Amino acid sequence: MNHTITIAGDDWYELISLGDGISLIRERYVADWLRCNIWHIQGKHQDLLIDSGLGLRPLKPEIARLSSRPVIAVMSHCHFDHIGSCHEFDRRLGHRACSEVYQDP
């Protein structure tokens, strides 16, 4: 018997614009103590994504709503709550000590 669990739909992510092309993205239904801040910074030719959350819902479509530029995903460290969606992005950067995790999350 298969059971399907639905994790919140289109409102999983909360997008907060801070102005000047900087947005805070939060996983709305994740407890504060477990949720990391996901930052999207718009650039002239490409954008930066700082951390990627737990990865319980796809993040890349949310980023596409903010910008059509290529994204460089930068992970501050390799804890699961910061790298969950990094696999969705072609360019992933982070500390050398975690390079294997970023290459194959």
Indicate residue ranges for each PLM-predicted region:
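Intrinsically disordered, low-complexity segments enriched in polar/charged residues with Gly/Pro
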Residues: M1-T4, I25-R28, H79
